[in-house]
Curated annotation (Swiss-Prot):
Organism placement in taxonomy: Eukaryota, Fungi, Dikarya, Ascomycota, Saccharomycotina
Top-rank taxon, per record: Eukaryota
Residues where Mn(2+) 2 binds: D85, N117, H167, H241
Entry's Gene Ontology cellular component terms: chromatin; cytoplasm; protein phosphatase type 2A complex
Protein name in UniProt: Serine/threonine-protein phosphatase SIT4
Length: 314
């Protein structure tokens, strides 16, 4: 067998075939080294495609790339920002996160991976990723490698200095972007404070702040986003974290916060469409809508189960 690296990994993972444990160890180490170089608010230049939650829906992630003009390649020069929640709930969290990591290694300056509330040891032990790794590898080793990568994911990205991209939302502890830049991010998602709020908070039709029903983060209102954007010279906050049936939604009359949701037919039953937000040099967002793949995760999983059942009787 020849030397295996990102090119071989990409060909394999594109077919939804998970990598060996030793390949995963090597991949996670490479990604960690790249992420260590990034700041808490990673600057990204337009043109860029912004993507919301994926939640382990691997075949829909492939559809996302088709909708956005293809996987990053030497020909496709678009930048991509992913807003977190790569894992849990879907059947192929492992393959989803692996594909994104391989693309990060191949095109480090074109793929920006932001941390979501599900990129956490505690949450993945409840919502599926831990169990998936255990089932697919027979141990928790690969889950541990991935969790180490989670700890180094950036907290935010900023497009041309004007569009802030985070997973969840704002925090009463953060008024200035510089307060995000100095947070210590190489750790498990905390239960409270600025870091926690960035991945857990939601916009709501209120004036300022309210307690979040999620039990972490806050609800923030139009006055909060208006002041935050004014102080930091921003024109828009792009975030994910909440299912929107129509794929994207602007909040508040100023339209200064937008939710981008990229998991179609969420959990294989919600019936929603998904979107990506494309931003050109004029910084005008353009949304591309896509639907779940017909022969997607469910049929692949069912076929695998049938194969296992037939093998059992051989």
């Amino acid at each position: 067998m020849g030397e295996r690296g990102p090119d071989q990994w990409l060909e394999q993972i594109k077919n939804c075939i998970s990598l060996s444990e030793s390949d995963m160890k090597q991949l996670c180490e490479l990604v960690k080294e790249l992420l260590m170089e990034e700041s808490n608010i990673q600057p990204v230049q337009s043109p860029v495609t912004v993507c919301g939650d994926i939640h382990g829906q691997f075949h829909d992630l492939l559809e996302l790339f088709r909708t956005a003009g293809g996987l990053p390649s030497d020909d496709n020069q678009t930048n991509f920002i992913f807003l977190g929640d790569y894992v849990d709930r879907g059947y192929f969290s492992l393959e989803t996160f692996t594909l994104l990591m391989v693309l990060k290694v191949k095109y480090p300056h074109r793929i920006t991976l932001v941390r979501g509330n599900h990129e956490s040891r505690q949450i993945t032990q409840v919502y599926g990723f831990y169990e998936e790794c255990l089932t697919k590898y027979g141990s928790t080793t690969v889950w541990k490698y991935c969790c180490q990568v989670f700890d180094f994911l950036t907290l935010a990205a900023i497009i041309d200095g004007k569009i802030l991209c985070v997973h969840g939302g704002l925090s009463p502890e953060i008024r200035m972007l510089d307060q995000i830049r100095v947070l210590s991010r190489a750790q498990e998602v905390p239960h409270e404070g600025g870091f926690c709020d960035l991945v857990w908070s939601d916009p709501d039709n209120i004036d300022t702040w309210a307690v979040s029903p999620r039990g972490a983060g806050w609800l923030f209102g139009s006055k909060v986003s208006r002041e935050f954007n004014h102080i930091n010279n921003l024109q828009l906050i792009a975030r994910a974290h909440q299912l929107v049936m129509e794929g994207f939604r602007y909040h508040f009359k100023e339209k200064d916060v937008v939710t981008v949701w990229s998991a179609p037919n969420y959990c294989y039953r919600c019936g929603n469409v998904a979107s990506v937000m494309q931003v050109d040099e004029d910084l005008e967002p353009n949304f591309k809508i896509f639907s779940a793949v017909q022969d997607g995760d469910l049929s692949v999983k069912n076929n695998a189960n049938k194969q296992q059942r037939s093998d059992y009787f051989l």
